[in-house]
Amino acid sequence: MSRIGKLPISIPAGVTVTLKDDVVTVKGPKGELSQYVNPAINVAIEDGHVTLTENEKEMIDNPKQKHAFHGLYRSLVHNMVVGVSEGYKKELELVGVGYRASNQGNIIELALGYTHNIFIQLPAEVKVETKSERNKNPLIILESCDKQLLGQVCSKIRSFRKPEPYKGKGIKFVGEVIRRKSGKSAGAK
């Protein structure tokens, strides 16, 4: 039995969890999410809690894989419950001279030192806001109820200019620590 998988998930007020044909659907004030669950995992919804257990009747080639599925699907369902009730938020910081970000609806325009600006069309589920204050690095604030989708979008934006180790220029998460390198040491033999 998975250590993560055996923990019950409490359902907050205003959130409903339903199970139909191995698909768990979670509805809440921030939106609706659904996730397929492998038949090797049983899902029980009772007394304001969701519990996942390994299905003893369902056979999988590798028993360790069943333990892995147990923890995986518990984490996915928990992320869905938190997402539709509270939502997820990530902030990206643009570090570099002349780096700018602006948005119009769900389209972000990035000026990252290339000869052209980069336009990124975001999914409808992700809300975006950009902040540019004088003498501060521009920020891109992304919010969504889907943790996986939010992470993928942030990773895609960050991939256009990853932070480099010498000056730290690039797109980084707020609070992320970039491992720095010293430059060439001139004259050292």
UniProtKB/Swiss-Prot annotation:
<dbReference type="InterPro" id="IPR002358">
    <property type="entry name" value="Ribosomal_uL6_CS"/>
</dbReference>
<dbReference type="Pfam" id="PF00347">
    <property type="entry name" value="Ribosomal_L6"/>
</dbReference>
<keyword id="KW-0699">rRNA-binding</keyword>
<dbReference type="InterPro" id="IPR020040">
    <property type="entry name" value="Ribosomal_uL6_a/b-dom"/>
</dbReference>
<dbReference type="GO" id="GO:0002181">
    <property type="term" value="P:cytoplasmic translation"/>
</dbReference>
<keyword id="KW-0694">RNA-binding</keyword>
<dbReference type="InterPro" id="IPR019906">
    <property type="entry name" value="Ribosomal_uL6_bac-type"/>
</dbReference>
<dbReference type="GO" id="GO:0022625">
    <property type="term" value="C:cytosolic large ribosomal subunit"/>
</dbReference>
<comment type="similarity">
    <text>Belongs to the universal ribosomal protein uL6 family.</text>
</comment>
<dbReference type="InterPro" id="IPR036789">
    <property type="entry name" value="Ribosomal_uL6-like_a/b-dom_sf"/>
</dbReference>
<keyword id="KW-0687">Ribonucleoprotein</keyword>
<comment type="function">
    <text>This protein binds to the 23S rRNA, and is important in its secondary structure. It is located near the subunit interface in the base of the L7/L12 stalk, and near the tRNA binding site of the peptidyltransferase center.</text>
</comment>
<dbReference type="InterPro" id="IPR000702">
    <property type="entry name" value="Ribosomal_uL6-like"/>
</dbReference>
<comment type="subunit">
    <text>Part of the 50S ribosomal subunit.</text>
</comment>
<dbReference type="GO" id="GO:0019843">
    <property type="term" value="F:rRNA binding"/>
</dbReference>
<protein>
    <recommendedName>
        <fullName>Large ribosomal subunit protein uL6</fullName>
    </recommendedName>
</protein>
<dbReference type="GO" id="GO:0003735">
    <property type="term" value="F:structural constituent of ribosome"/>
</dbReference>
<keyword id="KW-0689">Ribosomal protein</keyword>
